[in-house]
Amino acid sequence: MTYIQERGSTHVYHVNRMSKEEMDHMISLCVHEQPAYCVAACPFKMDTKEMLYYAAKGNFKKALAIYEKITPFPMILCDGCTAPCEDNCKLCELGDGVSIREVERAIVRYGEPGRRSSVFRMRKKKKAAIFGSGLFPLFLAGELEKKMYPTTIYCKEEDYESYIAAAAGHLLESDRSNEAKRLKSMDLSFEFGCSLNLSFIREKMELADVVCASEEVAKMLAPEEAADVEIMLREQAKIVSGPAESVMDAAFAAKRAALTVDLLVQNLSPHSNRGSEGAVTTKLYTNMEGIHGSNKIFCGQDGYSKEEAVEEAKRCIQCHCDECMKGCVYLSEYQKHPGLLAREIYNNTQIIMGDHPMNKPMNACALCGQCTVICPNGFDMSQVCKSARENMVSTDKMPLAPHEFALMDMLFSNSEAFLSRLQPGYETCRYVFFPGCQAGAIAPDVVMQAYEDLSNRVAGGVALMLGCCGAISEWAGRYEMTEKVNEQLKQELARLGDPIIIAGCPSCMKQLKESIGAHVIGIWEILREIGLPQQAKGLEIPVAIHDACGARGDAQTQDMIRQLLSDMGCIVEDTEYSRDLSPCCGYGGLTAYANKDMAAKMTEKCLERSDAPYITYCMACRDRFAREGRESRHILELLYGANASNMPDISEKRYNRLILKQTLLKNIWNEEPIMEKKDYTVAYTEEAIHMMDERMILKSDVERVLSDYRENQEAILDEETKELVTRSRLGNVTFWVRFVETEDGYLVHRAYSHRMNIMKRVGQ
């Protein structure tokens, strides 16, 4: 047996196979973090969705805190808000959108204003002066105070109440009083009752680093220059000013002006580094299937009561995109949208020294491609994880442990269990039957009957090749091993005369097409041409189809499988998430080896779609379903009337491959295989067999350990159980076996393994 050598952890191959640009492009396809439609329409980018979420729970304090993030004066803004968000509410497609503005007003009316933070904030050194009154100066004063600029306001008004009234005289007196209290609590300096003439203003301008003014004062200071509406600045006069037409315009202009102040004090261009201002276009996708329209709650002249506001807020459907997470166990288990998970996985690949916490999530993906089909933008999590695995391998940061057993199984399939023969009587063959490694491991009798049928009924000759297509090393990111498999398969195909491959597995079809560019067809295509075998018979009860991941995007194969089942008299029911949306059974991407719990949940997700027996056309799917106690059949079992063993363990799977090879050599090519015989027997308790299968310990591993024991006689006697314990290191793993000696050989009670090396002292 050839073992895979694990590279040293200190040796680094500086070959990065994942570029940041490619990852950024992929992450940009995920729309989960895109703003909701109402949020995108708001020039202030208020998180309307979150505000309505808290309002629906009756938590007006938190809802108000969200509203206060966008404006220093919520009563004034909500009174003059034109609610562009309402027209963009997704519910408008089904009826009435949410009355966001009225809910907003109720939040401001009933919500408890948050206390100003007691945390010390460092004031900026640069000073600002604001001349005049009105909506724009008021909002700007609040914005600059948030940014911690020492700000002085010069105005004609005599007190805070008058200053608020000059800006928002339309408010109720009680509301004006509340906003005046809010203004008074701010860290601002006011000089009331000023005579705002030119000499006074110019004198005070000398005391400030940045000058801001109402439009009226600005026109007096710079009558021939208008403010640039993009930056709210008269650039020649260096005066920040804004419009006073409406509450919304003034509040938005104040935000722009505050950013301009930031840039000016840093001696930067006021046109640069402004980011995205105002309303934006969102790429968010929200599936409205199953959502019903409703009428908005009637609102009287006095606005909503608390209870009415809560009911109206409850109508919000909290627009978001989690389509991929609904169908994918992997994403739903980690509770992270693909964009975030992909970013964390990419960052994991860039860690040079230390732990790599995202190795397990990276290896838990089934690489099935379901997310790509479901996502409206085609986000491919499988490509992210596959590239990350390759990157970790190429930089020598991927441990061998998660995938070693599967890789060793592939090497076994392509060495001891490998077979490549022309059909007797042919020098070259038109076809070669490639059933796949899992078919030979789980259903060897089916493989034999299928090959016998094909070789008898297909013109031009059908060769046979038993082996692995290389999908295992491809999934593991071990691209060098995949290249060796590809080279082996190419050489064998050339020796057979470059025949057309008849694949018995959709994953093999996909892998062989993509990796070696072979001409591959499915066995189902051939059987549709030549007709069903005589023994073909469907089940007499309705069955559910589970579509294989390898057939995703292959409508021809999906249709052909259904047609074959119909021809056999099967009553077929399609399930939710079928065809291209079909989930993975848990075997794909080597999830079953790297994360057994995740794989079990994937299998459960597949089986919960129907109570009927499952028909598959992937042998790995059929095996995983049978292990969960569900009646399942591979379509070839129905076509050839031969049932596979229900639950072959990992040792039986290898044994089945060897027996299949030896039987075919003997029966078809008249070659008598040489069988190695031992002069002792090894038996296993039921507990040992179950434990070995669970821990992926082969009988051949145990027998190698016992063979070493026979040579060195090294073992520990457990006085209590009278069992012997011996060990041996095979490849990268030390195996331990607990056994007793019998008359004929050994009885194994338990077996376990560790990735450790036992060192012996010299001379002891």
Please place each PLM-identified region on the residue numbering:
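Ferredoxin-type iron-sulfur electron-transfer modules and their immediate structural context
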Residues: M1-F120, K127, K181, A213-A364
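Acyltransferase donor/substrate-recognition loop-hinge adjacent to the catalytic core
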Residues: G531-P542
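Conserved small-residue-rich
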Residues: A40-A41, K127-T151, E157, T286-A342, ...
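Iron-sulfur-cluster electron-transfer modules
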Residues: A36-V39, K49-D209, Q335-G504, M509-H519, ...
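Short glycine-/small-residue-rich Rossmann-like dinucleotide-binding loops
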Residues: E215-V217, P376, P506, M619
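Cofactor-cradling patches in redox/metallo enzymes
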Residues: A166-S174, Q438-E525, G550-G569, E573-T663
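Ribonuclease/tRNase effector modules and their secretory precursors
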Residues: S645, D649, Y655, I659-Q764
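Hydrophobic alpha-helical positions that pack around
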Residues: I545
